[in-house]
Amino acid sequence: MVSEKIKQEVEKLRKEIEYHNYRYYVLAQPVISDEEYDKLMKRLMELEEKYPELKTPDSPTQRVGGQLIEGFETVEHSEPMLSLDNTYNENEIRNFHERIRKVVRDVQYVAELKIDGVSIALRYENGLLVRAITRGDGLRGDDVTANVKTVKSIPLRLPEPLTIEVRGEIFMPVQYFEEFNRQREEEGLLPFANPRNATAGTLHLLDPSQVAQRKLDSFMYYIVKPQQYDLKTQWDALKFLEKLHFKVNPHSKLLSSIEEVIDYWKEWTEKRKKLEYWIDGVVVKVNDFEQQNELGWTAKSPRWAIAFKFPAQQVRTKVLNITFQVGRTGTITPVAEFEPVELEGSIVKRASLHNFDYIKENDIRVGDYVFIEKAGGIIPQISYVLKELRDGDEIETVPPEKCPECGGPVGKESGEYVAYKCLNPHCPAKLKRHIEVFVSRQAMDIQGLGPKIISKIVDAGLVKDIADLYYLNIFDLAQISGLGPKMISNILSEIEKSKQNPIEKLLVGLGIPGVGEKIAKVLAKKYKSMEELSKADIKELSEIEGIGEDIAKNIVEYFNSPKTKEILEKLRKAGVNLESAETTTSNILDGLTFCVTGTLENFSREEIKRFIESLGGHFTDNLTKKTDYLLVGTNPGSKLEKAKKFGVKVLNEQEFLEMLEKKGVELKESWKKPKPKDTLF
């Protein structure tokens, strides 16, 4: 039994430590020495170790990192995290202003520094941080809560018991980025190209204690549904975030004219190098929320905001060679190889030249001196050829007569398309690129199969098409250098797991030209199976919203190919799902809301969601008092304790399946009922 005195001491220590965290990491105004701070933390850790029942998720001790993470759950955003339109010049920012003025008058702007980091969404319930989600594709992101808890400028508990979602940027300060890269080089590892890449990589580490060592920082700038907190402007929102103890960039400014915005941009174009973090521009937002709503959004970005980016830096280098890469469809892309040069914080050695017409139009030759820049601050490209420095030894580049990968014949597409392609249907480079697409997250999401391993598997003759992946075994992969038993086991497990993916993911992986995630979902919704889709004609397909005649033609040609029929048959025999998710088959779970924590034996998170919905139930990622059931697998998270606190009924997987059987649901024979000993209660 813990005495009341100990409980009070623990609570007092937590409040003191969080107060000093706020003074140091947010305000940069410490009032105690590091030694005094360390004593407070040490005492709290001692008490929590002695009385583990006093440890809570919002304790400052949880920032140092705890148990290893098994992986990252994909979570839907409460509202999309849209990107911003951007511009690089004053005329376009004035045009932006004129578009605004056509809709609203008396406009004010808030100008904020555009931090070069990773966008994050933070969800708080009753003042406690419950979830941190990366931007991902804007609709869904990765749950990186355990890692974000190590960022000391992000409060684990708000000073008010609010339920709120805020968004901002997590970044790696320049000082720590440079130290981190030096350390990587000393260890023989490749340095990160920029702080943004380093931050993204850090947030996806499986060990939170390693994340804590990398000293990430944050700035928050956005509140979801701000009117719920009686906020009328973006400037009000920034002040409210400060009140909630979030770190807000001190250089944000309220401006009354577009000329003031331009002056602000010019000021920071010069001053940005003096900052302790990287910025790549200025974000300009209409201040008034009512005006924002009146202006509205496009599908991709708000009309009331724009990123006013800094002009790209340019450096001079020499073209040492022009090499060729072969893509998934056989397209041959020329690539310029440079003398290594530093550009905006990274070493640039190469840049795509897109196609051979581009080389001809810009007269780019081996031996030329060129200026290069980063398009959008990211992608290296040649901006100017210094033809006046030529000495006559420069070499013009002509399209290859044979494929650089397989030696097969090369041809140019008819019509306006300017690419040269390898015509060998068995070119290994095509297969390698296709498999890279097939295993990608947007497609079959087979983790562990990176480009290097794929290349080795293809070169060893173990796979001749994407379907052959499902016939690999432990003896096949044991032939591949660099693959140990654990990695082989993980790869085979990932391949097996992917068999149950919905067919929209398989459709993306098949690589049909024009069929991405959005169209794949439309097709999976309309057609019950891959077989039914394969029988559709061009007229029928082209009448589907979002699918024009060109894509319809691509789909029909793909499914009419004998090779496609062979691949689909091999996939079917391997047990890969070729049928669409069932629509609601009954209403036995009608009105019931389910949430899941931990790893289930028979279902992935997406599969259990679809299964529950097919029975009329509702699936949610967020456990609340209104949730009816929490379904618990192995290694459950904090939702289990929350369910007990809220009085939500908890089921293990066996109990869930038995409940369905009693309600008359016919279970698949392949589903194993987990043994009672595997449950935690």
From Swiss-Prot:
GO terms for biological process?
DNA repair; DNA replication
Q: Where does Zn(2+) bind?
A: 403, 406, 422, 427
Keyword line: DNA damage, DNA repair, DNA replication, Ligase, Magnesium, Manganese, Metal-binding, NAD, Zinc
Catalytic activities: NAD(+) + (deoxyribonucleotide)n-3'-hydroxyl + 5'-phospho-(deoxyribonucleotide)m = (deoxyribonucleotide)n+m + AMP + beta-nicotinamide D-nucleotide
Q: Give the first-level EC class, as a single word.
A: ligase
Look up the signal peptide feature and give its range: none
What InterPro entries does the entry give? Answer: BRCT_dom, BRCT_dom_sf, DisA/LigA_HHH, DNA_ligase, DNA_ligase_AS, DNA_ligase_CS, DNAligase_adenylation, DNAligase_N
Positions with a binding annotation for NAD(+): 34-38, 83-84, 112, 135, 169, 285, 309
- What one GO molecular function would you report for this record? DNA binding
* HAMAP family cross-referenced by the UniProt entry: DNA_ligase_A
The name this protein carries in UniProt is DNA ligase
* Source organism (scientific name): Fervidobacterium nodosum (strain ATCC 35602 / DSM 5306 / Rt17-B1)
Q: What is the phylogenetic placement of the source species in the record? A: Bacteria, Thermotogati, Thermotogota, Thermotogae, Thermotogales
